[in-house]
From Swiss-Prot:
GO terms under biological process: cell wall organization; peptidoglycan biosynthetic process; regulation of cell shape; response to antibiotic
Family label: Belongs to the UppP family.
Gene: uppP
Name of protein: Undecaprenyl-diphosphatase
An annotated Gene Ontology molecular function: undecaprenyl-diphosphatase activity
InterPro entries in alphabetical order: UppP
Transmembrane segments: 1-21, 39-59, 87-107, 111-131, 150-172, 187-207, 218-238, 244-264
Organism the protein comes from: Pseudoalteromonas atlantica (strain T6c / ATCC BAA-1087)
Other information: Bacitracin is thought to be involved in the inhibition of peptidoglycan synthesis by sequestering undecaprenyl diphosphate, thereby reducing the pool of lipid carrier available.
Localization terms from the record: Cell inner membrane
Purpose of the protein: Catalyzes the dephosphorylation of undecaprenyl diphosphate (UPP). Confers resistance to bacitracin.
Length: 266
């Protein structure tokens, strides 16, 4: 990989991991437009580590409160808001784990085409627009129940289909359940932690069993750039989402999907 490829791919990973615009749609663009080869498993692990560190550091206060509350009262009848939120993250993670193990082979075999990614980018983008426009948007993250957490988790399982966007579909589900935009985004970001961690561990196991030739300079640069871009993305998104809404991201997804379709049928 050249330095230009490392920089572009790491920044793409950091930004698209948390914006509702589909990371897989963007990661396929360099190969479609520029003919770049796959970045390799080791680099994929490195940029995911950068993204994971970014979200964990940004939400370190929330994570600390949730862990303290969960270990303190998570198994008692006197639940606190933070202990319940910890449970909701756990519950919402379970469907992705189940469907991830059950459907991984099928998805990798049949759902990673540019056509599938283009269609899901457009289709789930329109669903995001509908949720943002029609939902009540008046509930706080602490108003969630185990049922709403499970619904968001089921939605997250759909993100195994490339082009769906994990953050996009979980925010869509949160909005449809009546969460305000910031709460939907915060829960989506908290939910990303176990998912990215799990995906990173699986990729690491694959890497150990079939090791690539490792370019440590590329991995370090990729991880750092992914961390910086992901942290900035989370900060700016939460600062602006209540004011700008989801429409800019929906429009962007429509354009991106159309571009991919043009290349598919060109």
């Amino acid at each position: 990989m050249t330095l230009t490829e490392i920089i572009i791919l790491a920044i793409i990973q950091g930004i698209t991991e948390f914006l509702p615009i589909s990371s897989s749609a963007h990661l396929i663009l360099p190969s479609v437009l520029l003919g770049w080869e796959n970045q390799g498993l080791a680099f994929d692990v490195a940029v995911h580590v950068g993204s994971l560190l970014a979200v964990m550091i940004y939400f370190r206060g929330d994570i600390g409160r949730m862990l303290v509350a969960w270990f303190g009262s998570g198994f008692s009848k006197n639940q606190t808001d933070d202990s319940r939120l910890a449970w909701w993250v756990i519950i919402a993670t379970i469907p992705a784990l189940i469907f991830g193990f059950a459907g991984k082979a099928f998805i990798e075999e049949y759902a990673r085409s540019a056509l599938v990614i283009a269609c899901t980018t457009i289709g789930f983008g329109l669903l995001l627009w509908y949720a943002d426009k029609k939902a009540a948007l008046n509930k706080h993250i602490y108003d969630m129940t185990w049922k709403s957490a499970l619904i968001v988790g089921m939605a997250q399982a759909l993100a195994l289909i490339p082009g769906t966007s994990r953050s996009g579909i979980t925010m869509t589900a949160g909005l449809m359940l009546g969460l305000d935009r910031e709460s939907a985004a915060r829960f989506s970001f908290l939910l990303s932690i176990p998912v990215i961690l799990g995906a990173g561990l699986l990729a690491t196991l694959d890497l150990v069993s079939a090791p690539d030739a490792v370019d440590w300079n590329a991995l370090i640069v990729g991880a750092v750039l992914s961390f910086v871009s992901a942290y900035a993305c989370i900060y700016l998104f939460l600062a602006w989402i209540s004011r700008i809404g989801m429409l800019p991201f929906v429009i962007y997804r429509m354009l991106l999907g159309v571009i991919l379709l043009l290349f598919v049928f060109a």
